[in-house]
Amino acid sequence: MENWRTAEIFPKLDVSPNVFDDIRTQTAEQLFENLRLYYGDDSDRYNISFEALLGIYCNRTEWIDFFHTSIAVAANVIRFNDLDKMSLGKILFYIQLPRVATGNDVTAPKETTVLVTKYSEKHPINISFELSAACLAHLENTFKNTILDQMLNINAIHTVLRSLKNSADSLQRGLIYAFIKTILKKAPPQFILKTMLENKVNSKQILSKVQRSNMFQNFKNKLINSLFFLNRTSNVSFIYRYLCEMVDSTTESILNNTNSYVLKDGTPINGVLLGTPNTIQILSNALSQHISQMTMSVPVSYGTFVMGKENAVTAIAYQAIMADFSNYTKNVATETQDQNKKSEIFENQTQHADLKTNIIQLSDKTVVLDHLKKVYKNTNIEDPLEQKLELTFFFPMGLYISKDSGFSTMDSRLKLNDTMENNLPTSIYFYNKDKLLQRIDYSDLLPSLCHPIIFDCSVSERIFKNAAKPTGESFNQLCQVEFVREPPSTFLSNLYNLYEMKKEIPKTTNMLKNELTTEDFYKSENFTLKTELHPFFDFTYIQKNRSTDVLCSPRILLGNIPLPLAPSSFHEARTNQMIEQAKTNNLNYDYTLKLVVESLTNTAYPELAYIIELLIHGNKTAFQILKDVVSQCITYWYNIKHILLFCNNFEMIWLITTYLGDESIPGIAYTHYKNIISILKLVKRTISISNFNEQLCGEPLVGFVNALFDNRLFPPFLNSLPKNEANAIITAGNTPLTQNTVKLRNYEVSDLNRMNLLDSTEIFTDVDRPSFETIVLSKIFYFCFLPALTNNKMCGAGFDVKSFILDFFYTEPFILPDDNFCELPITNNVLIELITEAVGPSHALTDLSCIGKQLFKSILYLTENTKILEIESSLDPSQRHGSSSNFKSLQHVLYNGLCLVSPINVLKRYFKPIPFNRFFSDPIICGLMNIEVQTYLNIFPHYQRNDGGFPLPQALSHEFHNWQRTPFFVYASCCSNSLLSIMTLATMHCKLSPIAIILQSRQKIHPGFAATLVRTDCFDINCLLYSSKSATSIMIDDPTVSTEVKDISTTYNLTQHISFLDMGLGFSSSTAIANLKRVKTDMGSKVQDLFSVFPMHAYTNPTVNSWVRHHVGIEKPNPSETDALNILSFGKINKQSQSILLHGQQAICEVVITPVTSDINFYKTPKNPRGRASCMMGVDPHNESEARKSLYDHSRVDSDAFVATTNPWASQEGSLSDVLYNINHRDQLGYNPKSYSPNAVFFTDTEIFKTNKFMFKLISDYSIKTKTCLDSDTDIQYSCSEGTDDVTHRPCQFLQIAFPIHCSSNQALLESRSKNGMTQLSETHFANFAIGECIPLQNIIESLL
């Protein structure tokens, strides 16, 4: 390998430099054979053939001269012949600061000289070319006499010249490319540079938290306001002002050479503004009044690097190249100094030429405006000013705007029909990049919402357990609840122990949550936030074995979501959706409901009615015996008191409508009873959103959607056990009931055994079991109808049957023979008074005795004493998954009990109030009937409430294992007494299961939670680069050539050594994202398929798993074990049909499940999609503990929304979305590594900490450089901090924000705004919303179409 100078390659060959042009002009270019692309030199070209004679290649590409490009304005080029030996360049500049003379005895400033240090940056470039052996052979021969020999030799000469000139041109292009890349490295984005200049600090000053946070916020604001500034406005003054800011933000060069780059009138050029051809064209059109084409003087040769007294260079560490430095220093400050060669750094005595270019006047600066298209044309190198940009967008779906706060900001531009889709939107509309309307609704989200991992809280539970337990006041509020299990045999005997102890019971977290308003719930003062991690699970602390433990239980029902996250009005709106879907909203039962409410709240309710209920206890034969008595009671109380008796008992209403339709009671009264049953059936039909006949896992599919159809949920009052199809564990004594332990009632014979066991824990049931429909209607009646119409002002009660029978009927005449029984009247005054109260005072004593004797006859069908059953059951197969597989729901049922709507006075000693369920635990009724409860309420009057706050006996109080929890009771306690309230309580029984979500979504019914959709899009962008004149010195030498000889050819490698030296007093260059070139992704509605992200997960029940996958649209079964391991190890990319690529690469929308009450204003400005800011400029991110608290400690106010969070299900450690999208948790779940997650950068804590450390360092670095080297540290090198490009190209990741898009919950609203160009304005139209984009991308993209 040899090293040659370019001039030494062919020393014996004397050829004119114009020989190439001469040959080209004398040959017909149309006959050139070398129109194909080839590499190197082909030896076949020198074979004797006709084609070879004409085979002369003509390169039509324009040659590039560095000095004739506008980028040269920013350079000062000097030749340094020994540059290849230089390893480090350190140059010190003496700069004298200007002074101002003063007077009036003011001390004049002293002469000040600043010593500025600059370091050179080495950047060699190289290019190679090949010459074939045949070519070199011809060059060694002299010209012969034949024309053919001369032509072959000329061809060889031409090959060499072409290669040399092409290589020289490549070096020139390479010099430009290397130079512009170097400038870009020291040209910070304008939004950073402007922020730093506005927040100047002393370089040695430590930034305060406030300063750092302000700088970060300014970064963000300036980026948002300046992104695509050429596209976003046609305001010429705005564009001009922005360009002036770019120019004014930069500093001048230390080297202020006024001899080069000046206009004809002597005006010096101050800098150069470079862009892509498209950007420059836009600027030229917009600012044509400020642009003119003028001639400027440019140098045509390099300067020479020498030592001289004028050049301010005092020391150069160039190793061997400056060994004779002492020769120069001897002459410093001596007369012989002038003998040194003059420096052309300052005295450019080089030749100059005139060049026409576009000049723009920006502020007081004269700037060259140009592009470098000719440099990169036909090359495989992209223009460095053509760059990539990734932006993340977020938008909400399914948010609920309450009617109370509903308003319209749209004047009268829009009118929407009064449909539930408009009153409770379940879709979101927006445009993709081709302005095609996109719509996403809940059915589109099913691949994300119904993945098994959503319904498994194992990871969340583990994180919650490992987290620090509450301390101080939080401990007192959250960690005092203790759940006690007792055998049901002791329930009644220990019923009032709690009240006798006169001990205040701590509130559960559910009670604490539901006492808060929506606004208060999201505040940092809400210490229950830490337990709100998942929409489908309750987390809480409990006392267990004298230590604090955690409890995680499935919420089971939608209505169990805390009311601040799913308020009452939202549930009513959902109900209206179901009513509209079922087409049942045109029926009017207002009068019946009004009558029932008056009846249930009447304090004079006859006590005999309760006795009749007990004697009949749902038995048809007993009802026939007492039919006349029932008829008389109903008739009297309806006609005289206008009260509908027995409307508190479902079985009585059912029997009345079945057997009293023969005009034995007033027709209007009978109609009301029929209406009650019709209402129940109407509710049943409304909430039945699936086919009754469809089965899944051997159960009705409708039972997977609503718990009222689930056999595992029992009615709260039973007189006969239904068929235990769910295999629930029913316990009445100390052991669970079985078919052998449940005895049948035999009314037809004298069953002394049953009579003896009336007050035992033995369970007896009728032969006729209630049907499925009857049980469903009974549950609707007791869980929906009664609570809605009484506002929970009811109480369960037990009855001492044996004592009552002995006291009232084990007397004369009832124990006399039949003849005497019929003749003698009743002598029991209490019984006579009870009967008189029930049937009216107009009856004679004989009539009253006859009624009493009818009551006695029904004793044949006597029931047993009241008992409390404890029913424990697993969840349905779709909810029996993951951590819920072993969960057992718990409910307590009153067997042979009563539902009291008024306190008992006369027969108080036989009745026992039993607050067994929060629907049926009215403290007033309990207190009036039991002295212990009354005393307890006097001590703790705040317990006189019907919203579930009245404490139940501890053995009956299992909030987190019950089907219905606090939100149900709170709603029922304050709802209106209307049909809507009844249906709302029914719809609140919808399950939080994948099957329920699928079927509701298909019917366009809101599933109970909103969603935040997050999408990342990729863009090709054009940038602007401004650099001050002579901002960078370029030191170059002659190229060196090395050869590599082979048999058929010789390769020549040309290396150009270049060293760059920053000459700016500060930042002398800046960049800006000027305009959008193209959108690479489709900006569409493709939703992330979690089944492909987490391929191994499946529902526990294979039938449920297949059903869900089929209805979600995942037809493929779960991968085999081998396939799953391959996916987890190597990843897998889903193959999609090519038709989907019509609009570009699909962007993935990921789903973050969000409460419906999240503030809509949060989505109108750039925010973090997790619902809480991840910026930690207020703390030191290197302090891991403080950084983690800033991220996850919700007792600290969020810096963006000024609340703790807007989405507790995503922002907290261990929350649902944190588990789904935090890569550190994904590793525990097994995921497809080739799946892309736009959410990962917002949820992965390690990456967030790393990003914040970087931003912390970035701000610190740039704050040091806010001043120039003249008034700051003179050793500062003004170059971009490491990672600045990443901030510019991926700002959302580093600023931890996503941008809102132009979207609307209603298509009409979106279209109305789009046609008016109102894409940046956010509006509200009652329940609907429209969000404006902060970056007007829709208008920008439209201008590109």
Curated annotation (Swiss-Prot):
Gene Ontology cellular component terms for the protein in this record: host cell nucleus; T=16 icosahedral viral capsid
**Where does this protein reside within or beyond the cell?**
Virion; Host nucleus
Q: Which UniProt keywords apply?
A: Capsid protein, Host nucleus, T=16 icosahedral capsid protein, Virion
What is the predominant subcellular site recorded for this chain?
A: virion
Top-level taxon of origin: Viruses
An example Gene Ontology molecular-function term: structural molecule activity
InterPro entries in the cross-refs: Herpes_MCP, Herpes_MCP_upper_sf
Quaternary structure (record): Homomultimer. Makes the hexons and eleven out of twelve pentons. Interacts with triplex proteins 1/TRX1 and 2/TRX2; adjacent capsomers are linked together in groups of three by triplexes, heterotrimeric complexes composed of one molecule of TRX1 and two molecules of TRX2. Interacts with scaffold protein; this interaction allows efficient MCP transport to the host nucleus. Interacts with capsid vertex component 2/CVC2. Interacts with the small capsomere-interacting protein/SCP.
Function, please? Self-assembles to form an icosahedral capsid with a T=16 symmetry, about 200 nm in diameter, and consisting of 150 hexons and 12 pentons (total of 162 capsomers). Hexons form the edges and faces of the capsid and are each composed of six MCP molecules. In contrast, one penton is found at each of the 12 vertices. Eleven of the pentons are MCP pentamers, while the last vertex is occupied by the portal complex.
Per the similarity annotation, which family is this? Answer: Belongs to the herpesviridae major capsid protein family.
HAMAP family according to UniProt: HSV_MCP
Protein name per Swiss-Prot or TrEMBL: Major capsid protein
**What species does this protein belong to?**
Human herpesvirus 7 (strain JI) (HHV-7)
Q: Which gene encodes it?
A: MCP
